Curated annotation (Swiss-Prot):
Name this protein carries in UniProt: Aspartyl/glutamyl-tRNA(Asn/Gln) amidotransferase subunit B
Coiled-coil segments on the chain, per record: none
Superkingdom of the source species: Bacteria
UniProt EC number: 6.3.5.-
GO biological process: glutaminyl-tRNAGln biosynthesis via transamidation; translation
Record GO terms (molecular function): asparaginyl-tRNA synthase (glutamine-hydrolyzing) activity; ATP binding; glutaminyl-tRNA synthase (glutamine-hydrolyzing) activity
Organism ancestry: Bacteria, Pseudomonadati, Pseudomonadota, Betaproteobacteria, Burkholderiales
Length: 490
């Protein structure tokens, strides 16, 4: 039986976070009434000329520097010719032979798959290029009975199309890459990453070939995948479809396909064009884009610390594990919250801060369906909770209750933890004399558990600890309870 190898390359369109469009001054704001953000340039009225948006170029430079690519000192805009109702000019301004960003790579972390018996691993994906281009408009097929409306608000919106080499070998790798790229463009501030609004969408080029064969199989391109789940499902379906087709004696044709999320399958859209079908030629209305070394140096000086560098710094500076550092730098907002938390709680509490951020805080964020930048508990408020754990004022269990109270109250005061501790009488009982008296009562009331422990049953000891904590309503210092019980039980 033939063993098949999957070959995947991704083309990702990241909408650049400029206020105006790439070749006009019209707004890029999402959600406006149709055709209210389309100026004469976007409408392709006679006599208009495009003017390149400097901000779009700087965002492309920033991306190129972040992935270790070559930023071309001279790149050229080209006309990509095709007819579609939402493309008023009859061509799209893009880059073809000389893109602004050339090469580069992104390291991805592919998670373990227990069902398939695969362990987690890292992989470096090489990029072919990233080029600037304008978006087309939007066809409104469902708004008019028997007709199609055209909304040109999106026409001319700046895009950075990021193209990988065909190096990914599974849907899991493709999704890991897409997530890494999504996180990076948001970290750099060049794209808002809103997949529902179409700010970040992927086209997947998928083919299969017998294991060991060098020649690529015929590829199908799946267009406009705007969620990671859709990307994974579409690739998995397409791989199965191609293998079944070949094994049944058929041939895969080069075509563009669409993914139907309701049926969880791909369907044919049109035959896939080659580059020569678009009749690319340099745009005579635009000068070559010249990027000097001084411009690159200035953009580099304004770059934020990159995730990989920050991850390594967290390991060295705060003593957290590589895994924890990876989670803490998963988004820029998460990393900033962690650093603010440690700054307030003290470096000695860095590991405690990391555990809380990845545990209780993340759990509450998931419960409410919000991101860390919308967290109702500020870093200063949480830092005080952690300090009260560290100085023995409260137990970890009580701290969780206080945290949830601050969260639900949406308290504004930085000293909320101390206020709640005082108001509810939540201070941990650390007085040895008081604890000894409580433990004596627990031992007297639980003679059977005492006998079982002395007979070698360790579970009985845990039962006694539980009874002591219950007697103090969770306010006892657990460590002291353990020590005193061991002392009294001999």
């Amino acid at each position: 039986m033939t063993q098949w190898e999957v070959v995947i390359g991704l083309e990702t369109h990241a909408q650049l976070s400029t206020v105006s469009k790439i070749f006009s001054g019209a707004s890029t704001q999402f959600g406006a009434q149709p055709n209210t953000q389309a100026c004469p340039v976007d409408l392709a009225l006679p006599g208009v000329l495009p003017v390149l948006n400097r901000g779009a170029v700087e965002r492309a430079i920033r991306f190129g520097l972040a992935i270790g690519a070559t930023v071309a000192p001279r790149s050229v805009f080209a006309r990509k010719n095709y007819f579609y109702p939402d493309l008023p000019k009859g061509y799209q301004i893009s880059q073809y032979e000389i893109p602004v960003v050339q090469g580069g790579q992104i390291t991805i972390q592919v998670p373990a798959n227990e069902k398939a018996g695969k362990q987690a691993y890292s992989k470096t994906v090489n990029l072919t290029r990233a080029h600037l281009e304008e978006d087309a408009g939007k066809s409104l097929h469902e708004d008019f009975a028997g007709m199609t409306g055209i909304d040109l608000n999106r026409a001319g919106t700046p895009l950075l199309e990021i193209v990988t080499e065909p190096e990914m070998r599974s849907a899991a790798e493709a999704v890991a890459y897409a997530k890494a790229l999504h996180g990076l463009v948001m970290w750099l501030g060049i794209c808002d990453g809103n997949m529902q609004e179409g700010s970040f969408r992927c086209d997947a080029n998928v083919s299969v070939r017998p294991v060991g064969q060098e020649k690529f199989g015929t590829r199908a391109e799946i267009k406009n995948l705007n969620s990671f789940r859709f990307l994974e499902d579409a690739i998995n379906y397409e791989v199965r479809r191609q293998i079944e087709l070949i094994e049944d004696g058929g041939e895969v044709v080069q075509e563009t396909r669409l993914y139907d999320p309701d049926k969880r399958e791909t369907r044919s859209m049109r035959s896939k064009e080659d580059a020569h079908d678009y009749r690319y030629f340099p745009d005579p209305d635009l000068m070559p884009l010249v990027i000097g070394a001084d411009w690159i140096a200035r953009v580099k000086g304004e770059m934020p610390e990159l995730p990989a560098a920050m991850q390594q710094r967290f390991i060295e500076q705060y003593g957290v594990s590589a895994y924890d550092a990876g989670v803490l730098t998963s988004t820029k907002a998460m990393a900033e919250y962690f650093e603010a938390l440690v700054a307030k709680a003290g470096a000695a509490n860095a590991k405690l801060a990391a555990n809380w951020l990845m545990g209780d805080v993340s759990s509450q964020l998931n419960r409410d369906g919000i991101d860390i930048d919308a967290c109702p508990v500020s870093a200063a408020q949480l830092a005080l909770v952690l300090q009260r754990i560290a100085d023995g004022t409260i137990s970890n269990k009580i701290a969780k209750e206080i945290f949830v109270t601050i969260w639900d109250e949406k308290a504004a005061d930085e000293g909320a933890a101390d206020r709640i501790i005082e108001a509810k009488g939540l201070k941990q009982i650390s007085d040895t004399g008081a604890l000894e008296a409580i433990i004596d009562e627990v031992l007297a009331a639980n003679a059977k558990s005492v006998e079982e422990f002395r007979a070698g049953k360790d579970k009985a000891f845990n039962a006694l600890v539980g009874q002591a904590m219950k007697a103090t309503k969770g306010k006892a210092n657990p460590q002291q309870v353990n020590e005193l019980l061991k002392k009294k039980l001999g």
